[in-house]
UniProtKB/Swiss-Prot annotation:
Signal peptide: none annotated. It is a multi-pass membrane protein. PROSITE patterns: DNAJ_2. One of its GO terms (cellular component) is membrane. Its main location: membrane. May function as a co-chaperone. The keyword Nucleus does not apply. Residues 1-50 form the TM2 domain. CDD domains: DnaJ (cd06257). This is DnaJ homolog subfamily C member 22. It is found in: Membrane. The chain crosses the membrane at residues 5-25, 30-50, 81-101, 105-125, 135-155, 186-206, 212-232.
Length: 340
């Protein structure tokens, strides 16, 4: 029986982040990915708005048995690669929250979780990859970064690159199974993913919060070499807390359990405060300085330390000039984010 485009859009609107429309269209891998990442971190769900007509067309064409199996190597997809890296890191963080107490965590659990996240993205749609090679890449990379809080980043990058090299079209189209069996299978995987996470978050809250805060700190420090990406990550991390603040009238978590998790958002806010303090020190201003004062001080320092005005000490001038530029951009970005 053919699928309705209107019904697909209805499910996209009602249960998009949970992948209901992908279940409706028989795309179980895609649905599972959306369930575990809340719609591909929200961005994938929004992107699917333009992709739904194509998915419906492909399903109905397959129903009419008028579909041919593609051969050869699929073209490289930057979007799929980015999704693999992000999902691999996400799976690694979830594993760290729920299973870091295991003695074999860094050597077995972490690379396994990251590789499975990478492979899940690889199996979306009519393509797939070689799970064996993806696992090998993850397990070979893991010992190099043993015990480091950001180890899931290089593991995910290596596994994603390996997965991309072994991408291929499926040899045959998946057979349509009963909905109950498909939901049962998806449910088991979902419980296996969320079970350890829920256990750790509820029964070992303080330790979990401490680990997450440490991992976030290491990640933000590593990303600080890319100011734009670092700022975007900080905003995304603070977004849930700010949304809560709007609906709760102040953002105060009254329950003890939620107060523990509030520490993570306080940690990110503190990280931003430290960056603002360092930027103020470079420009010779303070937290209470107005935008006009900051702009005036910036122009003065740029004029003093511009390399064209300091040919006799060019290297020192270039170093100070770049430092002033970075401090000014940081202050502008943080001040703008506070006004939003």
């Amino acid at each position: 029986m053919g699928k309705s485009l209107l019904a697909a859009y209805g499910l996209w609107a009602l249960g998009g982040p949970l992948g209901l429309y992908h279940i409706y269209l028989g795309r179980d891998s895609h649905a599972l990915l959306w369930m575990l990442t809340l719609g591909g971190f929200g961005m994938g769900w929004m992107w699917d708005f333009w992709k739904i007509p194509i998915h419906v067309y492909k399903y109905n064409r397959q129903e009419r048995k008028n579909i041919e199996v593609k051969e050869g190597e699929p073209p490289a997809s930057p979007i799929r690669f980015i999704g693999q890296v992000a999902t691999g890191i996400y799976f690694g963080i979830v594993a760290a929250i729920g299973l870091s107490f295991l003695s074999s965590f860094h050597m077995v659990v972490l690379p396994l979780a990251v590789a499975l996240g990478v492979h899940l993205v690889a199996t979306v749609g009519e393509q797939t990859s070689d799970l064996k090679n993806t696992l090998i890449a993850a397990f070979l990379t893991s010992p190099i970064f043993y015990g480091r809080a950001v180890s899931m980043i290089p593991i995910s990058l290596t596994a994603s690159i390996t997965s991309q090299k072994h991408m291929r079209y499926r040899l045959q189209q998946e057979k349509q199974e009963k909905l109950s069996l498909r939901l049962y299978r998806i449910g088991l995987v979902y419980l296996a993913f969320t079970g350890p996470l829920a256990y750790s978050a509820l029964l070992n809250t303080s330790l979990t919060v401490s680990y997450v805060a440490g991992s976030i700190g290491s990640m933000l420090e590593w990303l600080s070499i890319f100011p734009s990406i670092s700022a975007l990550v900080e905003r995304l991390l603070l977004l849930p807390y700010r949304v809560w603040a709007v609906f709760s009238g102040g953002g105060v978590f009254r329950d003890h359990y939620f107060k523990e998790w509030e520490k993570i958002y306080e940690f990110v806010a503190t990280f931003q405060s430290e960056k603002e303090e360092m930027a103020c020190k470079v420009l010779g201003v303070n937290f209470k300085s107005t935008m006009e004062e900051i702009n005036r001080k910036y122009r003065e320092l740029v004029k003093i330390w511009h390399p064209d005005h300091n040919r006799h000490r060019l290297e020192e001038a270039q170093e100070h000039f770049l430092e002033i530029q970075a401090a000014y951009e940081t202050l502008m970005r943080l001040r703008k984010s506070k006004t939003l």
